[in-house]
């Protein structure tokens, strides 16, 4: 669906923040995908929860704007998002794409950090 409209140039279509797609990246996005949760993105949700991304599970929320200092959360509690080596396990441990993908999107991990879905394997 996305490749054809991008090729035709009639509409600007792009594959959203739903995981790394390997060789298809250039066909469906303008840049390589890498989850930016906690790197360049942070979210404050309606209830005040501070999350590295609005799409991440609630057990990954790192604080609350009504109780915690946002800068402290950004600088200290988001550290696991910035060093993704902990994600290099299971299928990711031997994947040739890990250096680009960095373990896929945080919203695709369970509460123990296990990958629930690898978009690359689905292709």
Question: Which residue stretches match the model-derived regions?
Answer:
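A C-terminal junction/extension of Radical SAM enzymes
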Residues: 1-58, 98-100
């Amino acid at each position: 669906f996305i490749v054809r409209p991008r090729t035709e140039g009639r509409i600007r279509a792009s594959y959203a923040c739903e995981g790394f797609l390997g060789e298809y990246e250039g066909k469906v996005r303008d840049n390589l995908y890498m989850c930016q949760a906690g790197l360049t993105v942070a979210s404050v949700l309606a209830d005040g929860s501070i999350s590295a991304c609005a799409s991440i599970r609630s057990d990954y929320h790192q604080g609350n704007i009504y109780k915690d200092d946002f800068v402290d959360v950004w600088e200290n509690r988001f550290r696991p998002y910035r060093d993704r080596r902990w994600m290099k396990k299971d299928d990711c441990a031997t994947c040739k794409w890990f250096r680009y993908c960095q373990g896929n999107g945080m919203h695709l991990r369970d509460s123990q950090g296990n990958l629930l879905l690898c978009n690359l394997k689905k292709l």
